[in-house]
Swiss-Prot record:
GO CC field: ATP-binding cassette (ABC) transporter complex, substrate-binding subunit-containing; membrane; outer membrane-bounded periplasmic space
A Pfam family: Peripla_BP_1
GO MF annotation: an example: monosaccharide binding
InterPro entries: AraF, Bact_Solute-Bind_Prot2, Peripla_BP/Lac1_sug-bd_dom, Peripla_BP_I
Site feature location: The binding site for the sugar molecule has not yet been established, but C-87 may be involved: C87
Organism this protein belongs to: Escherichia coli (strain K12)
Keyword check for Transport: yes
GO biological process, one term: L-arabinose transmembrane transport
Name assigned to this protein: L-arabinose-binding periplasmic protein
Entry function: Involved in the high-affinity L-arabinose membrane transport system. Binds with high affinity to arabinose, but can also bind D-galactose (approximately 2-fold reduction) and D-fucose (approximately 40-fold reduction).
Induction record: Induced by arabinose. Transcription is dependent on the transcription factor AraC, the cAMP receptor protein (CRP) and cAMP.
Domain of life: Bacteria
Length: 329
């Protein structure tokens, strides 16, 4: 009996030790589509911080395309990872990612971009941590209106140029949120003009804005709405080309890190500022949720909306970027 008790104790001790070893050696992946982007570098940095705080190792892998994504999941499984956070290079890879992860009994959390199935429908069964697109758009509209009032513009001589990309869900929700906030603040709906861009970059938005400007020679002051910094910058460049002064243009982008060189210019331009989201929150929160799911069996909510955003302008951008771990960019 004495021997039997000792054996039981040894088994119990081994179980405890193996459990603590699992916690000690727990590995979780964090896969991103564009590792060269400051946004994703910050997500990785704060995923590492979560790992340090909670006691797990973060395996960071760049996944710029579908093939590399599926290979990365194989590598994670080979290294003993129990799950991963991913910003996919293509939302349509969702079904393949989930199937492969299931095959290895790995947990998956999507960050920044939601998976869609083969029919293009959102895969809302996969937990998602994402910027609150509508709320950030609303904030853009509110800040534009506030700055317009500060400058004392005559509303009758002012208009909104909304550079849209409605085929992209995030873009549509941001620009719609912005226009709705402007209307709610009292800006006349009939003076809100939408123009679609062929691409969400400076050249695409520049062409779209030019086509709008020639249609409205009566407008003396423009508010520029776009889904990111580049679309707003394209709009600002177009107004400069048409002879508008910086004081008659207010553009507020979304992203922040792409606005640094513009906000650093010696002279102010029509690009007033940008809404800087929170890659630090995305990186830490998604990793923490994955850890709790794997280590404690606490299933994360299907949708976690991140609303933390700060307006950066020429006056505060260096300090605010530093706070987010994006300084020196």
């Amino acid at each position: 009996m004495h021997k039997f008790t000792k054996a039981l104790a040894a088994i119990g001790l081994a179980a405890v030790m193996s459990q603590s070893a699992m916690a000690e050696n727990l590995k979780l992946g964090f896969l991103v589509k564009q590792p060269e982007e400051p946004w994703f570098q910050t997500e990785w940095k704060f995923a590492d911080k979560a790992g340090k705080d909670l006691g797990f190792e973060v395996i960071k892998i760049a996944v710029p395309d579908g093939e590399k994504t599926l290979n990365a999941i194989d590598s994670l499984a080979a290294s003993g990872a129990k799950g991963f956070v991913i910003c996919t290079p293509d939302p349509k890879l969702g079904s393949a990612i989930v199937a492969k992860a299931r095959g290895y009994d790995m947990k998956v959390i999507a960050v920044d971009d939601q998976f869609v199935n083969a029919k293009g429908k959102p895969m809302d069964t996969v937990p998602l941590v994402m910027m609150a697109a509508t709320k950030i758009g609303e904030r853009q509209g509110q800040e534009l209106y506030k700055e317009m009032q500060k400058r004392g513009w005559d509303v009758k001589e002012s208009a909104v140029m909304a550079i849209t990309a409605n085929e992209l869900d995030t873009a549509r929700r941001r620009t719609t949120g912005s226009m709705d906030a402007l209307k709610a603040a009292g800006f006349p709906e009939k003076q809100i003009y939408q123009v679609p861009t062929k691409s969400n970059d400076i050249p695409g938005a520049f062409d779209a804005a030019n086509s709008m400007l020639v249609q409205h020679p009566e407008v003396k002051h423009w508010l520029i709405v776009g889904m990111n910094d580049s679309t707003v910058l394209g709009g600002v460049r177009a107004t400069e080309g048409q002879g508008f002064k910086a004081a008659d243009i207010i553009g507020i982008g979304i992203n922040g890190v792409d606005a640094v060189s513009e906000l650093s210019k010696a002279q102010a331009t029509g690009f007033y500022g940008s809404l800087l989201p929170s890659p630090d929150v995305h990186g830490y929160k998604s990793s923490e949720m994955l850890y709790n799911w794997v280590a404690k069996d606490v299933e994360p909510p299907k949708f976690t909306e991140v609303t933390d955003v700060v307006l950066i302008t020429r006056d505060n951008f260096k300090e605010e970027l530093e706070k987010k771990g994006l300084g020196g960019k």
